[in-house]
Curated annotation (Swiss-Prot):
Acidic residues compositional bias, start-end: 504-517
Listed Low complexity bias regions: 530-564
Protein's UniProt name: Transcription factor GTE2
GO CC annotation terms, alphabetical: nucleus
Segments forming domain Bromo: 169-275
PROSITE patterns: BROMODOMAIN_2, NET
Biased composition (Basic and acidic residues): 390-399, 493-503
Principal location listed in the UniProt entry: nucleus
Keyword Transcription regulation: yes
Organism: Arabidopsis thaliana (Mouse-ear cress)
Domain NET: 389-470
Encoding gene, per UniProt annotation: GTE2
One Pfam family from the record: BET
Protein's cellular compartments: Nucleus
Length: 581
């Protein structure tokens, strides 16, 4: 199909005839009644005698012209026929323009055929002017097409056109975003180097074109974007990246231009990559909706899949059966294995070498068993806590805030008779203690790690000893303890096993080597007023501290978590003075 063209007028004939002849390229489908139409002349040769001669005869003087153009004698048409012809030619011209725009924009759908329906004009009959056929005036719109069996149906064509418009809209929005990114990039404080093309002559860069194959700058990218030379955002991004990669290729690493190009390239990727991902997602969405088959297509595909599956099942089953037949004779028939009856003795034979059974520990007293059970239950509840460091560890861990808080509360709960020992520990570790009269201010946060753990061991030993004594019911009044204290020794043994099981996780074994205290008389200490004021306790409390220190030293001898400093700090200095002579 080609647009109608105006043939050259022959001036001698034009003077004799008042009409004009318009020529149109001849199509494969002739107009209805054109061959028999007396006004139809397929030969535009003016030298022919019958160009405007007898209407009933047809002459083909120039046979080569037939099939190339169709001529219309405008003098023989009425006004209605001329209007119909004008509408027809305008419609074809609009269709050609529409197709041209689609081809240039790249949204042309291959496989769609755009043709013009053949319309018969009024008066194109054998009898001119005798009988005029009235045709209904039909409004001709853009894109009116001839029914073609090879063309796509009208609903699918409309869907393709709508999807093309959606894709074009998405592309336009993306290119607008690219322009905004380019403006932000050009406003960067380091982009002034890349705004204009490199002045090779002015800067004396004689080897620039040898290293850089395709020079590019942001100003050129902006100009190309405004002219619409980029068909996709990928082309735009490639030119922007080319600007910075050229600078990084020519300038050595570490120079200012290299660092500026590297920074701007990373910034461009940060701005552009999320936008590109959104654009690709929208494109996939549009393409997915365009490739979505209709119900008839689904039915057709389903039928084809079923036929293919049934056709595929047959050969597979046959081949599998053949393979099984070929494998069967290859398998030898093995005789059944003989049945072996095994009679088992009711008792298995003893092994020749048996390790000697471990010696059973002697039965523990009831009090010791209760103490070990209590320690085990306590250890079960402390699985989530951090283990306390041993006294002989050179590198002890830092005490946590919770442990410091508990230590402060336990120090405030100490009885007055234990304050003397507490002061001795503090004076041994800290030289200068802030003292206000009889009161000493103690800042736990200011103490070092060793002092904190030593105070913790001192408080823990006292609390364990006091709880065991109260639980067993051997002490009625702390100020007046009894003279014979065999339960104290028994408590010390139980405490030793409890601490050993709590920290080392070993089994509690009593080997019966504890020295009974009832064979020895209790120690009584007589102190004067000055010594009593220095120690801060009474004679009864001194007796208690002496016995407590003996049990504490006894427990420290069998425990891995104890320390020699505890035993020294717990024992009263007056006992040492008395034992010295």
């Amino acid at each position: 199909m080609a647009p109608a063209v105006l043939a050259n007028l022959n001036e001698p004939l034009f003077l004799g005839q008042c009409g004009a002849v318009f020529m149109r390229k001849y199509t494969n489908q002739p107009l209805s009644g054109d061959i028999n139409n007396p006004l139809f002349n397929p030969n535009p040769n003016p030298n022919s005698i019958s160009a405007y001669g007898n209407n009933s005869s047809k002459h083909f003087d120039d046979s080569s012209a037939y099939g190339d153009y169709v001529s219309f004698d405008l003098d023989g048409y009425t006004s209605n026929q001329l209007r119909e012809l004008k509408k027809r030619l305008n419609s074809e011209l609009e269709e050609v323009r529409f197709l041209r725009e689609r081809i240039e924009s790249g949204t042309f759908v291959s496989g769609s055929v755009y043709t013009t329906q053949a319309r018969s004009f009024a008066g194109e009959t054998n009898d001119v002017g005798v009988k005029k056929t009235k045709t209904k005036k039909k409004k001709i719109g853009h894109g009116q097409k001839r029914s073609n069996p090879f063309a796509t149906d009208e609903p699918s064509l409309k869907r393709h056109v709508a999807l093309d418009l959606m894709s074009e809209k998405v592309l336009k929005s993306m290119m607008t975003t690219c322009g905004q990114i380019l403006v932000k990039l050009m406003k960067h404080k380091w982009s002034w180097v890349f705004l204009n093309p490199v002045d090779v002559v002015g800067l004396g860069l004689h080897d620039y074109h040898r290293i850089v194959d395709k020079p590019m700058d942001l100003g050129t990218v902006k100009m190309n974007l405004e002219k619409g030379l980029y068909r996709s955002p990928i082309d735009f991004a490639s030119d922007v990246r080319l600007t910075f990669t050229n600078a990084m290729s020519y300038n050595p690493k570490g120079q200012d231009v290299y660092l500026m190009a590297e920074k701007l390239l990373s910034q461009f990727d940060v701005w552009f990559n999320p936008t590109l991902k959104r654009f690709e997602a929208q494109e996939v969405k549009v393409m997915g909706s365009s490739s979505r088959p209709g119900p008839e297509d689904n039915q057709r595909v389903w039928n084809q899949n079923n036929v293919a599956e049934n056709a595929r099942k047959g050969p597979e089953q046959i081949s599998i059966a053949k393979k099984l037949d070929s494998v069967k004779p290859l398998l030898p028939t093995l005789p059944p294995p003989p049945v072996i009856e095994i009679t088992r003795d009711p008792s298995p034979p003893p092994s020749p070498v048996q390790p000697p059974p471990p010696p059973s520990p002697p039965p523990q007293p009831v009090n010791q068993v209760e103490a070990s059970l209590e320690v085990r239950e306590t250890n079960k509840g402390r699985k989530g806590k951090l283990p306390k460091p041993k006294a002989k560890d050179p590198n002890k861990r830092e005490m946590t805030m919770d442990e410091k808080g508990k230590l402060g509360v336990n120090l405030q709960e100490l009885p007055p008779e234990k304050l003397g020992q507490l002061i001795q520990i503090l004076r041994k570790r800290t030289r200068d203690l802030p003292q206000d009269g009889d009161e000493i201010e103690l800042d736990i946060e200011a103490l070092d790690n060793e002092t904190l753990w030593e105070l913790d061991r001192f408080v823990t030993n006292y609390r364990k000893m006091a709880s065991k004594i109260k639980r067993q019911g051997f002490i009625q009044n702390v100020s007046t303890p009894p003279r014979n204290m065999p339960p104290v020794t028994e408590m010390g043994s139980a405490e030793k096993r409890g601490r050993k099981g709590g920290e080392a996780g070993e089994e509690d074994v009593d080997i019966g080597e504890d020295i009974p205290v009832e064979d020895y008389p209790s120690v009584e200490i007589e102190r004067d007023g000055t010594a009593a004021a220095a120690s801060g306790g009474s004679s009864s409390s001194g007796s208690f501290s002496s016995s407590g220190s003996s049990s504490s030293s006894d427990s420290e001898s069998g425990s891995s978590s104890g320390s020699d400093s505890d035993a020294d700090s717990v024992q009263s200095p007056f006992v040492e003075a008395k034992e010295a002579p």
